[in-house]
Design a protein with these regions (language model features):
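N-terminal Rossmann-like or analogous alpha/beta NTP/dinucleotide-binding catalytic cores
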Residues: 2-8, 13-135, 283, 296
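Short, polar/flexible loop-turn hinges at active-site or ligand-entry regions and domain interfaces
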Residues: 53-54, 144-148, 236
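Short, histidine-centered active-site or binding-site loop motifs used for metal coordination
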Residues: 11-13, 44-46, 143-144, 205, ...
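A generic secondary-structure signal for well-formed alpha-helical elements
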Residues: 65, 72, 100-103, 142, ...
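Internal, conserved structured core segments that host functional sites
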Residues: 110-169
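Short helix-capping/linker segments at secondary-structure and domain boundaries
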Residues: 102-106, 139-146, 255-264
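Conserved nucleotide- and phosphate/pyrophosphate-binding catalytic cores
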Residues: 21, 159-338
């Protein structure tokens, strides 16, 4: 591991993971895990920035970790851990809060979008979400962070805080915090809603028909694809801006089948929606079956799951505490003699 560069990423346990989480994030981690020292977090502190059910949070956290492994993450070479189990996340977040100008935060696009959705229920936590994300990344001296286009601004904020507000102010020679670089995930990075091709597939969408969950049984997948928004045109296209639903479903089919987009377009040039929906349904059911089988084995083996998380937490906590100690020392905090 010593010679490998390190990556850090994570998903919120805010409900069932869907194919957007899988194809846009987890599937890419599976590809990267052999090349990088990989730390993967279940970001449960982020999950409480919006309305949530306390009775479901712990269950969803375990389920998310199990799905990481079921989707192909290898706990023998990756550290899988739970954010709230490592107090350094919250502590570094507070330190970064005190170093970050508020006008930097006011520029965050996602807060503006999400605050409209939440109305009067917007919390300080939602506003502060990007600072906690910065703490998540910077704690682990990540060399790279896999991000989609919608998360680029948050990573840029983490980089700016580390360089301009910590390194430049408190260290004249060696950097206190490592400046992470993005790995922009193009393949499947933005899987869209089944009922509105202009919106990203989301766990928070109240309409269950907008997404395919990783644990959906075949009959539910069939029903959701059958009801997915389509149009009156013949042929399934990718580059027609007036047909976002066509582009979205073709992208999903392309990734799952392992075929190039151009090959899929040629294959379905004169195919009607009914035929295409039948084919993509079959592909989804076939692709999700091994994930669902492995998930059921894991979720029914709490000893194995706890072992995976305990080992991951131990590695993550050791690394996080080293970084936090370094930051606090450079920023002038009192250190108790032992």
């Amino acid at each position: 591991m010593a010679n490998k560069k390190r990556i850090l990423s994570g998903v919120q346990p805010t409900g069932d993971l869907h194919i957007g989480n899988w194809l846009g994030a987890i599937n890419n981690w599976v590809t990267l895990q052999e090349q990088y020292e990989t730390f993967l977090c279940v970001v449960d502190l982020h999950a409480i920035t919006a309305s949530y059910n306390p009775k479901e949070l712990s269950k969803n956290t375990i389920s998310t970790a199990a799905l990481y492994v079921a989707c192909g993450i290898d706990p023998n070479i990756c550290s899988i851990f739970v954010q709230s189990q490592i107090s350094a996340h919250s502590e570094l977040c507070w330190i970064l809060n005190c170093m970050t100008p508020i006008n930097w935060m006011e520029r965050m696009i996602q807060f503006k979008e999400k605050s409209i959705q939440q109305g009067n229920n917007v919390s300080i936590g939602l506003f502060d979400y990007p600072i906690l994300m910065a703490a998540d990344i910077l704690l682990y001296d990540a060399d790279f962070v896999p991000v989609g286009e919608d998360q680029k601004q948050h990573l840029e904020l983490a980089r700016d805080i580390a360089q301009q507000r910590i390194n430049a102010r408190f260290s004249k020679d060696k950097n206190i915090l490592k400046i992470p670089q993005p790995i922009i995930m193009k393949n499947g990075s933005k899987i869209m809603s089944l009922i509105d091709g202009s919106k990203k597939m989301s766990k928070s969408d109240p309409n269950e028909g907008s997404r395919i969950n990783l644990l959906d049984p075949p009959e539910i997948i069939t029903k959701k694809i059958k009801r997915a928004k389509s149009d009156s045109s013949i042929g399934i296209e990718f580059n027609n801006p007036e047909r976002p639903e066509s582009k979205n479903l073709l992208m999903i089919y392309s990734i799952l089948s392992g075929k190039e987009i151009s090959q899929c377009e040629n294959e379905f040039l004169e195919t009607g929606w009914g035929t295409f929906k039948k084919l993509i349904t079959e592909q989804l059911i076939e692709s999700l079956e091994p994930i669902q089988k492995k998930y059921k084995l894991l979720i029914n083996d709490p000893y194995q799951l706890n072992k995976i998380l305990n080992e991951g937490n131990e590695k993550a906590e050791d690394l996080a505490n080293q970084t936090l100690k370094r930051v606090k020392s450079k920023l002038g905090f009192f250190e108790m003699e032992k």
